[in-house]
Amino acid sequence: MKATIIGTGSYIPEYILTNQELSTMVETDDEWIVTRTGISERRIQKSGDVADMAVNAALKALDNAGINSEDIDLIIAATSTPDYLFPNCSSIIQKNTGAINAVCFDISAACSGFIMALSAAKAYIEAGMYKKVLIVCSEKMSGITDWKDRSTCILFGDGAGACVVESSEQEGVKSVDLHNEGMLGEVLTAKRNENIVMNGQEVFKFAVKKVPETINTLLKKENTDAEDIKY
C-alpha cells in the first residue's frame, strides 16, 4: 500500500506585520528585507494558542479530504512552540476535532517538522499499522522572536498547515531522504523561555549545500530528471 495525500488545510492569523511596520521596531527597511529574503509581510497570532491554529488547519484538511474526524487513526503534530509540555499538541487537536479513535504524538523538528511527520506517516501506513493519518504543523514563532534582533525577527511568523494521508493502492508519496547534522545544532537555537538565536551565515551555508544534495538524491531514487519536475 502507498501513502497518499487526500486533503490539505491551512490557517494564518488575521494580523499582518509588514516590513514597513517592522522598520519602526528595529533598524531595517522594506528594501533591505525584500532583497535578502523575499519577505514583505508575516502573520502574527495576537490571540489564541498554537493548538488553536492547528485545529483550524486540521478541520479544513478533514473537510477537504471529505472524511470524518472519527476516521483518523493517527495524529502527528509537528511543532517547536507547543502551548504545554503536556498534554501534547496532537492530543489537543484530537479533543477539539473529535478524532476520538486516533493515537497521538508530537514531533519537534523545527523547519523540518512537516517532512519528518510525513515520513513517519508514510512508514506507518506502508507497514499496515494505520490507514488514515492527520498531520498538523503549527508554529507561533512570534512568541520566541527577539523583535530587536534584525537577523531573526524579519524571518519568522505564525501559522499552521495540515494534511490527511491515506493508505491507497494509487500512487502516493514516492521517496523521502532524511539527514541530520547534530554537530551544527548551536547555529540555530531556542532555549526554554528564551528567544531564537541564529548564526545566519552558517545556516545559509548549510542550506545551500545540503538542500540541493538531498533533491538530487531523491531525483536519482526515482530515476527522474530535474527538468521533469513541474512544481
At which residue positions do the language-model features occur?
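Beta-strand segments within the central parallel beta-sheet cores of soluble alpha/beta enzyme folds
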Residues: 33, 70-78, 105-108, 131-138, ...
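Acidic, glycine-rich active-site loops and adjacent beta-strand->loop/helix elements
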Residues: 11, 78-83, 109-114, 137-142, ...
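Flexible, glycine-rich active-site loops centered on histidine and acidic residues
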Residues: 126-157
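Condensing-enzyme catalytic core mediating Claisen C-C bond formation in acyl metabolism
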Residues: 1-47, 149-209, 213-217
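Conserved beta-ketoacyl condensing-enzyme motif
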Residues: 5-7, 48-105, 224-231
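Conserved catalytic cysteine-centered active-site region
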Residues: 34-36, 40-52, 80-133
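Buried hydrophobic packing segments
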Residues: 54-61, 117-121, 214-215
